[in-house]
Amino acid sequence: MKKSLFCGVCLCALVAMGGTSFADIMVGVGAPLTGSQAAFGEQIKRGVEAAVAEANAKGGMNGEQITLVYGDDAADPKQGISVANKFVGDGVKFVIGHFNSGVSIPTSDIYAENGVLMIAPGTTNPTFTERELWNTFRTCRRDDKQGIVAGKYMADNYKDGKVAILHDKTPYGQGLADETKKSLNENGMKETLYEGVNQGDKDFSALISKMKAAGITAVYWGGMHPEAGLLIRQMADQGLKAQFISGDGIVSNELASIAGDAVAGVMNTFGPDPRDDKANAELIKAFRDKGFEPEAYTFYAYAGVQSLVNAANAAGSNDPMEVATAMKEKGPFKTVLGDISFDAKGDPSLSPYVMFEWRKGEDGKYNYFQK
């Protein structure tokens, strides 16, 4: 077993249905529950809890109830490794998580060596599954597919303009920016600027001045919503009237809170919104009745639990390796994202990425709507 001296793990157990017993199946939830990306952690937590409650009410995994164990990775690879080691030490055999590619990739090695199957609801970097470990699955799409859509969109719509591609130097952000750049170039357009900033930066005035001087008309951001919101707001404040485009790392209502009215017209790629599927109406109402809007990765986490439970029941076993085999061979599995099958790498069969635009909804609040 790999061990780590990293500390600071926030770990607690939740009994999903009734009292804990030695026969319960422990499922770890690895996500950023604190820090700048806690909004995504909350989405994952809520989605997993709701799906586990439903699964346990229907008999759990092969008749065994599911107990959830939480690990706060704070979107930090080092803390993620600490979470993974703690999960392994506690006997967790299944993990829904992690969210960030930079956390999921190193933790997956620990899980693979210790017989733990993981299903990542938001890890989009292709490397995660391209290594073809036995235990890595995701319920989200990949950045190479996302970059194709974003790059072509910019080449088609801004061919007479100038594009800046920015990223946050993380495996997710830079990986997405690189895939988008590749697609942009393959579609006959060359970016004017390609630059990285540090995750956590708050003052982008120098970068914005540089983009203004270069005559930038479209900005692509590979990164998360905290920096995106600041970039959008500061671009408006400094008079840079360029179209802002990003990926699935900004799909949080916190983006509008940070950017303010400047968020209007911002575009991003993401999968079709499960909230638009009438089959999910009852589930959506249940979330909203509890004061929670099930945006973004809520449904991807929910689908992760559904895939795990359905595969285990199809295999007639709760052994992680047997469940992994069933996930690849016994699909499709019915989920809130639709019927999902997994290929030999652990990637799901999902519809392509589409473009969204941020604008005010009927409730007067900003949200992202499919174009």
From Swiss-Prot:
Keywords: Amino-acid transport, Signal, Transport. This is Leu/Ile/Val-binding protein homolog 2. GO terms for biological process: amino acid transport. The keyword Transport applies. InterPro entries: Leu-bd (IPR028081), Leu_Ile_Val-bd (IPR000709), Peripla_BP_I (IPR028082). Belongs to the leucine-binding protein family. It comes from Brucella suis biovar 1 (strain 1330). Residues 1-23 form the signal peptide.
